[in-house]
Amino acid sequence: MKGQQKTAETEEGTVQIQEGAVATGEDPTSVAIASIQSAATFPDPNVKYVFRTENGGQVMYRVIQVSEGQLDGQTEGSGAISGYPATQSMTQAVIQGAFTSDDAVDTEGAAAETHYTYFPSTAVGDGSGGTTSGSTTAVVTTQGSEALLGQATPPSTGQFFVMMSPQEVLQGGSQRSIAPRTHPYSPKSEAPRTTRDEKRRAQHNEVERRRRDKINNWIVQLSKIIPDCSMESTKSGQSKGGILSKACDYIQELRQSNHRLSEELQGLDQLQLDNDVLRQQVEDLKNKNLLLRAQLRHHGLEVVIKNDSN
């Protein structure tokens, strides 16, 4: 495995592995394994892989991806190494110290070389003090003698992943404790902002408060207009319902009084007409009386007017 990695990294700074090639020619089953279509395992066309059998016919596979930065002359050796059988579940555990300092000096860029190691929990879950297992994937970053816990970088960043058996990785490596992340994720603390619903609620409350104030003012004015309420309000607090009830009674009384006054006004109008007719009749009688007196004087008769009071 280590020799394959060196050969891939030292030949003119590029890694060239044909899709479906067999890593070990000794296994007769490798040819059948290499015929598996790439779309079934890795839908990304940029990922190349090689299948091989190991330890009793268990299928292991190696995936290599070269970024454009490495082809342009960037530092080689930066990559990710991960391994798990193709037939097992994806539940993985982290094994610390998978690469020792002796393994790291085999290449020219060993001082800055970074490895990300993945292992299935079923293969390394027994007797591992620094092993963690779960549905999520943990990553051990090994740089020289220090080990840091980080997250796996997606393949789009250009790193490559090498899958191998756990026995090849664990030989000669001592386990170390996993350190926490150097740069923990800290969500941005935003100042509390008033949401649209809160603004709408505050505006609605303000409108309701103004409406209640207006209603209270009108009720106070009614209590001042109604005679009974004005006296009771000075003695004890008058309820709004009592004020409105007395206001309704007072309005009913006013309506009845107005109706009665309208009827009396109609009677007065009729009396006025009768009075005018009587006055006209009195005037006519006076004129006739004067004519009769004039005729009596013409005939030599004197008219003596007797006073009833005498």
Curated annotation (Swiss-Prot):
One of its GO terms (biological process) is response to hypoxia. There is a cross-link at K306 (Glycyl lysine isopeptide (Lys-Gly) (interchain with G-Cter in SUMO2)). Residues 1-17 have a biased composition (Polar residues). It holds the Pfam family HLH. InterPro entries: bHLH_dom, HLH_DNA-bd_sf, USF. Residues 199-254 form the bHLH domain. Its main location: nucleus. Transcription factor that binds to a symmetrical DNA sequence (E-boxes) (5'-CACGTG-3') that is found in a variety of viral and cellular promoters. PANTHER family: FI24210P1, UPSTREAM STIMULATORY FACTOR 1. This is Upstream stimulatory factor 1. The gene is Usf1.
